[in-house]
Amino acid sequence: MANAREILNRMRSVQDTQKITNAMYLISSTKLKKSKKMLEETEPYFYTIQNIIRRMLRHMPEMEHPYLNSREEVKDEDRTRGLIVVTGDKGMAGAYNHNIIKEAQKWMEENPNHRLYTVGEVGHHYFVSKGMPVEEQFHYTVQNPTQHRARLISSTLMDEYERRQLDEVWILYTYMINSMSMEVRMERLLPLRKERFSANQLPSDIPMEDFEMLPSPQAVMDMAVPEYITGYIFGALVEAFCCEQNA
């Protein structure tokens, strides 16, 4: 039977553990609020870019552009698809990392002609340990998502898409629905899905106004799409970070 001193030591140990756990929770909560605030502050700009693309496609539904070209001449089995997988940096988030990796493996089995890109140490180490080639690891901590890092990621993938090294670009991340639930999301970034910018997704009070695109529709699209892709990746990084903190 434990003596009084041993019991006191165990009580102190439990109390110390509780203090550490509470401190970790407070830190995670603070980081989560900070990241959500950062996303909310940048959303208006990226929504504006998205609306520019919507307006262009609404006025010119038959517009042709490399970012809209689905490359139908390339057979499905010959298409090279790039996948950005966003995981955590640590394995302490339980099902959070497991669900992402499980979904990534399923996708890669269905798309054998793929190129893998990782953000987050957990995913990178897992795929490497399983002998799965990683095309590029973006050495950015998931703990600090920034627009600059999102822009570097989008620039790399868009460059490979433009040089036809990739026929499609996808991203896999976790989206926080609310503080109690989250879900794994897979989205194709390139080529753009026109239905994401369809007129019926716009508020009904937006008029079908005439407008002029200078210097040309192609130039406007050249500017708008990279900004849109960067905004989507940044949002995915922030959502993934919030999910990890909340897991």
Which role fits each region the language model picked out?
Residues 1-247:
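C-terminal beta-strand-loop-alpha-helix "lid" module of Rossmann-like NAD(P)-dependent dehydrogenases
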